C-alpha cells in the first residue's frame, strides 16, 4: 500500500497513458467498424460516442497535446508491432527447428491434423497428442521465463508492467486484425487469460521466490527441470508406443 500511495506521479502518468491509449483505440476502431459495413445507425452512434470522448479529452489536455500524443502513439504502435512481429517470427523459427528434430514435416503440418489421417493411423493420433503437449510445454516455458524475469526486474512494480503489456497487446491485436474484428476475438481472449494468470491470483505470482507467498515454494529453475523431465518421459513413452505399433504391423 505504501508503494502505491507514494507513487502519485506514476499513477497520474499511468492514468494519462491509459486515456491516450483509449483515445487511440477509439480512433482505430471506427475504421474496422466501417470496413465491415454494419448498419448506419450503429456506426453513427459509435462515431458520436468517439467524437464526444475525443472532444472531452481535447478540452482536458489541450488539442495540440492530444495531436502530439496521437502522433507519438502512432509511431510507438508501429515500432511495437514491428518488434512483436520479429519476436513471433523468432519463436516460430525455434518451434520449427524443434519439429524438425522430432522428424515432422514443418511445411505441411495440416496433414497431422486431418481427421481422415488420424482415423486411418493410430500412430498419427499419438503423434498429434505429442505435438499438442509439446506446444503447451513450449508456450508455458516461454511465458513462465518471460514473466519471471519481469517479476525479478521490476519487483513490486510488476503490476504496472502487466497493465502496459496488456494494453500494448490489445493495441497490437487490433492493429493486426483491423477490418476483421471477428478474427481478433480469440487472440484477445488469450491475452486476457494470460493477464489474469499472471495476476495476484495467478501461478507465477503465488509461487515465485520473490512473491508475497511462501518462500519455501520451488524456484523457477526447479520447475523448468521438472517440465523437461516430463517431456523426456513423454517422448520415451511415445517412442515405445510407436515401436509396438510398428511391430504389430510387421506381424
UniProtKB/Swiss-Prot annotation:
Sequence intervals crossing the membrane: 13-33, 125-145, 146-166, 185-205
Modified residues (N6-acetyllysine): 229
UniProt key word Phosphoprotein: yes
Compartments where located: Mitochondrion outer membrane
Keyword terms: Acetylation, Coiled coil, Membrane, Mitochondrion, Mitochondrion outer membrane, Phosphoprotein, Proto-oncogene, Transmembrane, Transmembrane helix
Tissue distribution: Most abundantly expressed in brain, liver and kidney. Overexpressed in leukemia and lymphoma cell lines, as well as in various carcinomas.
Pfam family, one: BRI3BP
Residues forming coiled coils: 217-247
Membrane topology: Multi-pass membrane protein
Modified residues (Phosphoserine): 248
Any GO CC annotation of this UniProt entry: mitochondrial outer membrane
Listed PANTHER family: BRI3-BINDING PROTEIN (PTHR31253:SF0)
Function statement: Involved in tumorigenesis and may function by stabilizing p53/TP53.
Self-association state and partner proteins as the record states: Interacts with LETMD1. Interacts with BRI3 (isoforms 1 and 2); the interaction with isoform 2 is weaker than with isoform 1. Interacts with BRI3; the interaction is weak. Interacts with TMEM238L.
Listed name of the protein: BRI3-binding protein
Lineage summary: Eukaryota, Metazoa, Chordata, Craniata, Vertebrata
Protein's gene: BRI3BP
Amino acid at each position: 500500500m505504501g508503494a502505491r500511495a507514494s507513487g502519485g506521479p506514476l499513477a497520474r502518468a499511468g492514468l494519462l497513458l491509459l486515456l491516450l491509449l483509449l483515445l487511440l483505440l477509439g480512433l482505430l476502431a471506427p475504421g474496422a467498424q466501417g470496413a465491415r459495413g454494419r448498419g448506419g445507425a450503429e456506426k453513427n452512434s459509435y462515431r458520436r460516442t468517439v467524437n464526444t470522448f475525443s472532444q472531452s479529452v481535447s478540452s482536458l489536455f489541450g488539442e495540440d497535446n492530444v495531436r502530439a500524443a496521437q502522433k507519438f502513439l502512432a509511431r510507438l504502435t508501429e515500432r511495437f508491432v514491428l518488434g512483436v512481429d520479429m519476436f513471433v517470427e523468432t519463436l516460430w523459427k525455434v518451434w520449427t527447428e524443434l519439429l524438425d528434430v522430432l522428424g515432422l514435416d514443418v511445411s505441411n503440418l495440416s496433414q497431422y491434423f486431418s481427421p481422415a489421417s488420424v482415423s486411418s493411423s493410430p500412430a498419427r493420433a499419438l503423434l498429434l497428442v505429442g505435438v499438442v503437449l509439446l506446444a503447451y510445454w513450449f508456450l508455458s516455458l516461454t511465458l513462465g521465463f518471460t514473466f519471471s524475469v519481469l517479476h525479478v526486474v521490476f519487483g513490486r512494480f510488476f503490476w504496472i508492467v502487466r497493465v502496459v503489456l496488456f494494453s500494448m497487446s490489445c493495441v497490437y491485436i487490433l492493429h493486426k486484425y483491423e477490418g476483421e474484428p471477428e478474427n481478433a476475438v480469440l487472440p484477445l481472449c488469450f491475452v486476457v487469460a494470460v493477464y489474469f494468470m499472471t495476476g495476484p491470483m495467478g501461478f507465477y505470482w503465488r509461487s515465485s521466490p520473490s512473491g508475497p507467498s511462501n518462500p519455501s515454494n520451488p524456484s523457477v529453475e526447479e520447475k523448468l527441470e521438472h517440465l523437461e523431465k516430463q517431456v523426456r518421459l513423454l517422448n520415451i513413452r511415445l517412442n515405445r508406443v510407436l515401436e509396438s505399433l510398428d511391430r504389430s504391423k510387421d506381424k
